[in-house]
Amino acid sequence: MNICVVSTFEGDVEEFMSMVAEFDEEIKEAASTIEFGVVNTDKVGFSKIITIANITNEERFQGIMSSPRMIEWDKAHNNTDVIYSIEKIS
């Protein structure tokens, strides 16, 4: 299943990428590919990341997204994730 996650949060992109690095092994168990794009918000202190991933283990992915560490990070950074299911066309 291909997904797009739009994450909007208070903090720097580096903080987000550091958090993702903490989940590196778990992500490898849940996704065959994952890519990140940075969106310029033009707002000091606010960041937006677009993540595209091919999820191969939905249960594992859900476990990552709802883990205590992830929830703690989300709360600390006032993060909002909007998740879309996407279909590859070509």
Q: Where are the model-predicted features located?
A:
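Short S/T/G/P-rich N-terminal loop/turn motif that feeds into the first structured element of a domain
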Residues: M1-I71, T80-S90
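Regulatory input/activation interfaces that engage signals or partners
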Residues: A76
